[in-house]
């Protein structure tokens, strides 16, 4: 009996390790772009919830500031901040836009997308804005761990895109970063195996 239990334990551990390895491989091999372009029509900065008092959260701050740096570096002449009031009453796009303007970005270079409730909708609504302005390419800025899943969504679109990582917030520990990577790697593995759930926001993602 003890011998059988040991064998089962070994099998379980082996399966867990295999799943971890598979997750890492899938996560690390997701393409980060579909183009060789280095300059784009716009920079899409993906939202994340603000603090309960409406101030930028650490990741929201870093994503915004990186978008601003890319804008000032001439990567694109415009910024789309995307994200609605998904997890509290504050519209993520508006919080980020205010921060960007405080860093010297003119309001005329900013478009706020304030409806999206998740990453799929971030891309869907941002693409609509691009079409309205005849913008054909985009650099997409988000937190490092979030970008592979974002790329899986972007693969539904044929316009030229590239993902770009914002720095981790200085206040995040290595453990916090590891947790973010682990959660996202697991999510990407599931999406590679089972695909995305049916969604009208992906159904029409053909351009």
Model-derived segments and their meaning:
Residues 24-181:
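A structural signal for short, hydrophobic/glycine-enriched beta-strand patches
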Residues 205-207:
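Hinge/cleft segment of the Venus flytrap/periplasmic-binding protein
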Residues 174-201:
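A transmembrane-helix-recognition feature enriched in membrane-embedded lipid enzymes
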Residues 3-4, 60, 146, 187:
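Short alpha-helical segments used as structural interaction elements across diverse proteins
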